[in-house]
Structure formats: C-alpha cells, structure tokens
Design a protein with these regions (language model features):
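Typically the conserved alpha-helix immediately C-terminal to a functionally engaged Cys/Sec
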Residues: 65-77
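Structural micro-motif
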Residues: 104, 108-119
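Thiol-based oxidoreductase modules, predominantly thioredoxin-like and allied folds used
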Residues: 79-100
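Non-catalytic, surface beta->alpha helical segment in thiol-disulfide oxidoreductase systems
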Residues: 120-153
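Non-globular targeting/processing and membrane-anchoring segments
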Residues: 10-14, 25-26, 30, 111, ...
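N-terminal secretory signal peptides and thylakoid transit peptides that target proteins
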Residues: 1-17
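N-terminal "domain-start" segment that seeds a small globular fold
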Residues: 25-42
Length: 156
C-alpha cells in the first residue's frame, strides 16, 4: 500500500471514528437516570428544596428524546433532580411507599397515557405542580417547564 493510500485510509478511518464518537456522545447526553428508589430520590430533591421531576418516557418516542436532549438532560447535569420511568418497562423500582413495583406499573398507577409526561413530586410523593403532557410546542416547552418547577417549589 502506497504512503498516499495509507494516509488516505487513516484519514477516512479517523473521520469515521470521530463521527461515531460524536454520535455516541450526543446519545449519551440525552439520557436521564432511571428511577430506582423514589423515596430516596424524593428525599434528596427535598433536601435541596426542589420537587422531584419524573419523566415518563417510552422507548422510541421522538418527542421524549427531544425533551431530554434540549431541556431535561442539561438541567439534570446542572443539578435539577430528574429521574426517568419508562412505560412498558419491567425494570424494578421502589414506589413512594417503599414497595417494590415496576416502571410500567407506576405509569399505570399514575394514569399516564401520553409520553413524554413530566410529574412533579413533593412531600409524601404527592404531585405539587400540574403535569406536563406531550412536547408538541417546542418553542414553549422550556418556559412551561420553568413555570411548573416554580409551581412545585412554591408548594413545598
């Protein structure tokens, strides 16, 4: 293999690896921690005088991905207490009463039928702000989210 062809091959491989890495990082940036113990997660949120935000998501939901990527993941990385519960997911989780259940059972208990849905929980696992259902108004999603967080904080 000539030096020119070898250099061209390495250049193309580098571009491909760089693009793959950027794609993987953008996907990683759009994740939220899965709820595992709602009592513990709520306790931590309340210590910081903040409602616990629970995003109900569904695998493959484009609106969910957009809400995570544009708003929720950056907020969570900045310290806002946000966890995710997935519809149709049998992953175990402790509910607010400390009982073992699944993500899917929680979504049914909370009567969530639209994704994404954001719920804002305060003391005792009670909802302290109006739910945000859907993400079909992207220009207003951020202001609506900030309003719900303020509503939740006021109720604490």
């Amino acid at each position: 293999m000539s030096d020119l062809r070898r250099r061209d091959w390495f250049l193309r491989a580098g571009v491909l690896l760089g693009a793959t890495s950027a794609w993987a990082q953008s996907g990683a940036a759009a994740t939220l921690p899965a709820a595992q113990s709602l009592p513990d997660e709520l306790s931590q949120a309340l210590k910081n005088k903040h409602p616990l935000i629970v995003m109900v998501s569904l695998d493959g939901c484009g609106f969910c991905h957009r809400a995570r990527q544009s708003h929720l993941s950056p907020m969570q990385r900045a310290g806002t207490p946000i966890v995710q519960v997935d519809m149709r997911n049998p992953q175990p989780v402790l509910d607010f009463a400390g009982k073992l259940t699944t993500h899917d059972q929680l979504t049914r208990l909370w009567k969530v039928s639209i994704t994404p849905t954001l719920l804002f929980f305060g003391p005792g696992g009670k909802e302290v702000a109006e739910r945000m259902e859907g993400a079909y108004q992207p220009d207003f999603y951020g202001p609506y989210l900030e309003d719900r967080i303020a509503q939740g904080r006021k109720a604490l």
